[in-house]
Amino acid sequence: YKDSSWEIRGQEIGYVFYSSLCYHLFGSNFNIYLLFTNFLLIVLFYKSLKYNEIRTGLLFILFFFAARLYLQYNFILLRQSIAMTIVWVWAFPFLLKEEKIKFCFFICLAAVFHYTALIALLALVMNRNLNIKYIIIAICFFFVLSITKVVDKILLLVIERCLSVLGSSEGIGEKLSKYLLESEDGEFRGLNLLTFIEAVPFIYIVREYKSILFSSFIGRFYTNMFYIFILLLAITMNFGFLTRMCQYFIFSYFFLFSFFIKNAKSIAERRTMLFLFSNYLLIYSVRYIFIWFYSTEYSFFLFKL
């Protein structure tokens, strides 16, 4: 890629190779490229549910995926979407089988498409008997620090030191700043309450059905993943890029919801949860469309429906 532009050189080699292959297969029509890629990713996402023993409530989980992740990740953050899919469909299932070498291989493969996949290596500790009380305390602690902006200063200091030690170029520093400081006035993104509101139903599930979840290896694995995911969100909630980096662990939501649909104590409880969460997802998806399309020529069409 000697003659490639700066933007292409800044992409991971796996994504560049895949895009180049699609270019030779389909030509320069970007819509066909998106159609093929997203069809492939949706099929693999469905496979990932099966491979992770998620067999109940599949239609609702697909609705969850479409409303919560599809518009953003499968179009705007396509590289990370590919990496997330690789982690979900191959890496996590191999870890559940305790095949750690294969797990690490697929994490590295995912990182070739988007380097944030390396954070999924944290899953290596999620199959252990973690002390959930300490994790909850850590969540509360970092939540307070994030609200008071203390975590912001610490993370920026660490990043600056790391870049200094690595001798990174100014271009990388500018790109990183663009990811971290997302508002127009150069401030941190700030707290997104929806991130934590959507976690409330799952907090109920892991607390109410704790004994059943921890009675199986896979239940303990995804319960631990959920708590660590919330901890990471509490740490990174003021940094949009870092928050998105943690989304590999949102897969725990899919498992927990499928588990709940299957094990709900009553039909009324199941229906109430489905009603509340369905309405939340509808509001979330409409809000997201509003944010991204309101100022474009498509806004009239979208909101006229």
Walk through the language-model features, giving the residues of each.
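Short hydrophobic/aromatic helix or loop-helix immediately within or flanking a transmembrane segment
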Residues: 2-28
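Alpha-helical transmembrane segments and terminal signal-anchor/GPI-anchor hydrophobic tails
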Residues: 16, 123-245, 292-305
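Signature aromatic-anchored transmembrane alpha helix within multi-pass, membrane-resident enzymes
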Residues: 139-140, 265-287
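Membrane-interface transmembrane helices that cradle and orient dolichyl/undecaprenyl
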Residues: 84-102
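Transmembrane-helix signature of polytopic, membrane-embedded enzymes
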Residues: 49-66
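Membrane-interface alpha helices of multi-pass inner-membrane proteins
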Residues: 102-126, 230
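Short acidic/glycine- and proline-prone juxtamembrane loop motifs at membrane-interface regions
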Residues: 74-81
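Transmembrane-helix motifs of polytopic, lipid-linked glycan transferases
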Residues: 36-52
